[in-house]
Regions:
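Conserved beta-strand segments that form the floor/walls of ligand-binding pockets within enzyme
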Residues: 10, 34, 55
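Short acidic-glycine-tyrosine-enriched beta hairpin
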Residues: 21-36
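Short beta-strand/loop turn elements enriched in aromatics
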Residues: 1-5, 56-59
Length: 62
């Protein structure tokens, strides 16, 4: 759900899929991501392996 703010993340292990609007990006261990939260976004793990990441939201809405 779009909302005010910005979001940043860093993948610690595995890989995640970041969906921004209609585009999908795969982020792997050691990679980071950033986006303006005012558009549709989703973070998911589309594999059977575990994934861990740090997620920072500003302002802290959740």
């Amino acid at each position: 759900v779009p909302h005010e703010g910005e979001e940043f993340g860093f993948v610690l292990d595995g890989k995640i899929t970041l969906t921004l609007g209609k585009k999908k990006y795969v982020c792997r261990r050691g990679e980071s991501f950033y986006y303006s939260a005012d558009r549709t976004h989703k973070i998911s793990n589309e594999s059977n392996a575990k994934a861990r990441f740090i997620w920072i939201s500003s302002p802290p809405n959740f």
